[in-house]
Curated annotation (Swiss-Prot):
Probable core component of the endosomal sorting required for transport complex III (ESCRT-III). ESCRT-III components are thought to multimerize to form a flat lattice on the perimeter membrane of the endosome. Several assembly forms of ESCRT-III may exist that interact and act sequentially. Forms a metastable monomer in solution; its core structure (without part of the putative autoinhibitory C-terminal acidic region) oligomerizes into a flat lattice via two different dimerization interfaces. Gene3D superfamilies: 6.10.140.1230. It is found in: Cytoplasm, Cytosol; Membrane; Endosome; Late endosome membrane. Changing K49D: Strongly reduces binding to PtdIns(3,5)P2. Residues 22-54, 149-223 form a coiled coil. This is Charged multivesicular body protein 3. Keywords: Cell cycle, Cell division, Coiled coil, Cytoplasm, Endosome, Isopeptide bond, Lipoprotein, Membrane, Myristate, Phosphoprotein, Protein transport, Transport, Ubl conjugation. The record marks V48 as: Important for autoinhibitory function. Probable core component of the endosomal sorting required for transport complex III (ESCRT-III) which is involved in multivesicular bodies (MVBs) formation and sorting of endosomal cargo proteins into MVBs. MVBs contain intraluminal vesicles (ILVs) that are generated by invagination and scission from the limiting membrane of the endosome and mostly are delivered to lysosomes enabling degradation of membrane proteins, such as stimulated growth factor receptors, lysosomal enzymes and lipids. The MVB pathway appears to require the sequential function of ESCRT-O, -I,-II and -III complexes. The lineage of its organism: Eukaryota, Metazoa, Chordata, Craniata, Vertebrata. Residues 151-223 are annotated as: Interaction with VPS4A. The record marks R217 as: Interaction with STAMBP. There is a cross-link at K179 (Glycyl lysine isopeptide (Lys-Gly) (interchain with G-Cter in ubiquitin)). The modification Phosphoserine is found at S200.
Length: 223
């Protein structure tokens, strides 16, 4: 559909500038989410070290899986920033074309970037809105419905490879959990003597509550 196929409330240049502002705003949101997840990851690292000292192998594995999920989430957020940069570059090109041709043009680069961005849950709503506006303006073509579906790889992350879990544990404990790339079935370091390991049943319950709270915080940050 061409730019002037339907009545436009705003001129093309204003539309492009508005889209660029929205993209930059979402990039700041993504940056903030990355920082929040990474801060929480540092807390998880400390918890892994504490659990290793107490000989809590299962807790270590659970926390390592949380770190894997968090790192995958951060990687996706960084990828989304790259796509948003591509869209911003596309917007600059549109302004250049607008000055010469007097109208906006279709852009396969912007189309590809937007197809990826509408799959990112953290920014999905804004990207859908922008996509619809860009379709009306004729910059991108209508996207298939399945491109709007949120990608849920929770199951995949639940089955994180043992090698990756072991690598995380080896990294955090500086090799205290065995030698890389050994499996997580390797014995943990001997528990600390006497007082340190004479934890009461109440302490164990507190540990479980702390673990659940940490998992909940990470899940909230990733969603």
């Amino acid at each position: 559909m061409g730019l002037f196929g339907k009545t436009q409330e705003k001129p093309p240049k204003e539309l492009v500038n508005e889209w660029s502002l929205k993209i930059r705003k979402e990039m700041r949101v993504v940056d903030r989410q990355i920082r929040d997840i990474q801060r929480e990851e540092e807390k998880v690292k400390r918890s892994v070290k504490d659990a290793a000292k107490k000989g809590q192998k299962e807790v270590c594995v659970v926390l390592a899986k949380e770190m894997i999920r968090s790192r995958k989430a951060v990687s996706k957020l960084y990828a989304s920033k790259a796509h948003m940069n591509s869209v911003l570059m596309g917007m600059k090109n549109q302004l250049a074309v607008l000055r010469v041709a007097g109208s906006l043009q279709k852009s396969t680069e912007v189309m590809k970037a937007m197809q990826s961005l509408v799959k990112i849950p953290e920014i999905q709503a804004t990207m859908r809105e922008l996509s619809k506006e860009m379709m009306k303006a004729g910059i991108i073509e209508e996207m298939l419905e399945d491109t709007f579906e949120s990608m849920d790889d929770q199951e995949e992350m639940e089955e994180a490879a043992e090698m990756e879990i072991d690598r995380i544990l080896f990294e955090i404990t500086a090799g205290a959990l065995g030698k890389a790339p050994s499996k997580v079935t390797d014995a943990l370091p001997e528990p600390e003597p006497a007082g340190a390991m004479a934890a009461s049943e109440g302490d164990e319950e507190d540990d479980e509550e702390d673990l659940e709270a940490m998992q909940s915080r990470l899940a909230t940050l990733r969603s």
